[in-house]
Amino acid sequence: MCVGARAGGLPNVGSLLRMLCMQYVHDSEGWFSGARRCPSPNFNARPVGVDPELVVVHGISLPPGCYGSGDVEALFCNRLDPSGHPYYAQLDGLRVSAHFFIERSGALTQFISCDDRAWHAGVSQWRWRTDCNDFSIGIELEGVDVHGYENTQYQTLSWLLVGLFCEYPRLSIEAVVGHSDIAPGRKTDPGPAFNWALLRRLLRNKFRPGESGRPLNNSSSNR
């Protein structure tokens, strides 16, 4: 059963900490109160002693290139009808999930506790480590590689990342990567249309020295 009303992305306003406390409160079980909760059965425990150290940004739409169908949620909750679209035959029996899904409107849904291991990365490697699902948080954005993502999605993503950074000290903007970065040659999302420079700018505007104690790297890189 899914809980919480659908809502738009969070506003980009004022004090980071006050807004964070009101909007994205991380509870003792790894769920964020600012997200609609829709538990997926597709998860398992992280290895003992392993906390999130990486955030993987994905892009997804079902059917491909179509938005607002509700079928991404159906896929993550094992309710996708394989006869609903010709593309879905290849997804029959697939068991995948992400911790979060951000719709085109900016609405945020959480499927898996951040304390648990979602099944989003597949065969993957980051730096010297494999099996990125073990130590990562997966965030799916509704979209395709070559279509620009919505400003509301960037706003919600940036606020969510701020909340994650506050909860998990090993996370930082340098540890936010695309699926294509950890599975090159196998995955291409979130694709060339994803604006990494905009995401960095939004995060720098929220995390300022003296406010968080962890200022972001002011690199001018597009990544």
Name each model-derived stretch.
Residues 139:
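Conserved, mostly hydrophobic/aromatic
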Residues 22-33, 130, 135, 144-223:
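Basic/polar, cationic surfaces and motifs that engage anionic cell-wall
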Residues 16-130:
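N-terminal catalytic cores of peptidoglycan-degrading enzymes
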Residues 4, 15, 220-221:
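Intrinsically disordered, low-complexity repeat segments enriched in small/polar residues
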Residues 8-10, 14-15, 214:
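Short, low-complexity intrinsically disordered segments enriched in A/P/G/S/L with frequent Arg
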Residues 12, 40-42, 64, 191, ...:
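Generic low-complexity segments that are intrinsically disordered, proline-rich and/or Lys/Arg-biased
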Residues 2-8:
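Compositionally biased low-complexity segments enriched in histidine and/or tyrosine
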